[in-house]
Amino acid sequence: MCELRSGSQLIEHSTKAEERGLDFLSISDHIHPWLPEHEHSPFAWSVLGGVAAATSTIDIITGVTCPTFRYHPVIIAQAAATIAEMSNGRFTLGLGSGERLNEHVTGTEFPAVDLRHAMLHEAMDLMTELWTGEFITHRGDHFDADHVKIYEQAGTPVPMVLAVSGDQSLDLARDTRCAGIMAIDPDAELVEGWLERGGSAAGTWAEVPFAWEPTKEAGLKTARRFRFGIQGWEVAAELPNPAYFEAATQFLFDEQIGDAVPHGPDPEPYVQAMQGFLDAGFSNIAIVPVGDDFDATMDFWENDVRPQLQLSTGTTNGK
C-alpha cells in the first residue's frame, strides 16, 4: 500500500515482487494519503521512474491517475510516454475521474461526476493524439494545447485502463478505446458490460487488501489502516483531506472492518475475496499489502492463498 511506504521502499518492493515472479505492479497517484496515520504519499511519477529503471520484466500500472485537475493531460501524456519508454513498453496508464482528496489542491473546482467524465474523455482523446508523435494544437471545452509534440515515445501509444463503476464509465472506456477496465467491487456486471462493449477479458483489473499478521487480533488492528475503503466511493470521492476520512471512519465497528478487509493468519478470507473477483471475471488482481512485513505477506500469498485459488488468467501485484 503506497500510503504506508516511502518512495525508496516502493522501489525496493518492486524488485522483490519481480524476483518472486509476480506479474504486475500498481501504484496509486495521490498527493495526500487516505488517513493521517498513513504518513506517506510519494510523487508517483518519480517512483515510477525508479521502478522502471530497477526492474526489467514485471508490468507496471497506475491505479489510478486523474489527468484533469492538478495535472494537465499534456503533462500526463509526456510522463506516461517517458515511463513506457524507460520500461520498454511495460507500462499501462490507469485513469480515473479523481477524488476531491487529491484534486482540489491547486484551488480548482471539483465538479459533479458527469462533468468530470466529460473532462476525462477530452483529456484521454488529447493524450491519444499526442502519442502519435505529431505536433498537436487543441482548443477544447476544458483543455487547450498549443503546438505541442511529445518527443519521448515508446514506439506505440500507451495503453489506457479506466476505473469504472457503471454504464457511464463503461461507455467512456469504450469510446476512448481503452485497453481495459479497473474496479473495486467484484461486480460481474461490470465485466459483462465491458465484454459487451467489445473489451477483452484479459483487460480487467481489481485489487484485494491483505492485512496479514501472525495473529487475528494483530490482523484486525492492521486492517483498520484500510478502513477508508469501507464507506463506498460516493463518499470517498468527496472528502477533501485525511482528517475528514478519519472523522468519517472513526465510529466503524471492528466487525465492519473485519468483514470488509481480509486479515490475520487464516488464508480463507483472502481466498474468498480473491476468488470473488476471479469468479466475476476479473483477470488481474492486485494484492495490497496493508501490514508492515512485505516479505511475510508475499510468503503467505505464495504458500497459503494462491494454491487454494481456482485460477485461469489471474495475476497479482504488490501495490
Question: For each of these PLM feature ranges, what is it?
Answer:
Residues 1-319:
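Active-site-adjacent structural elements that line small-molecule/cofactor binding pockets in enzymes
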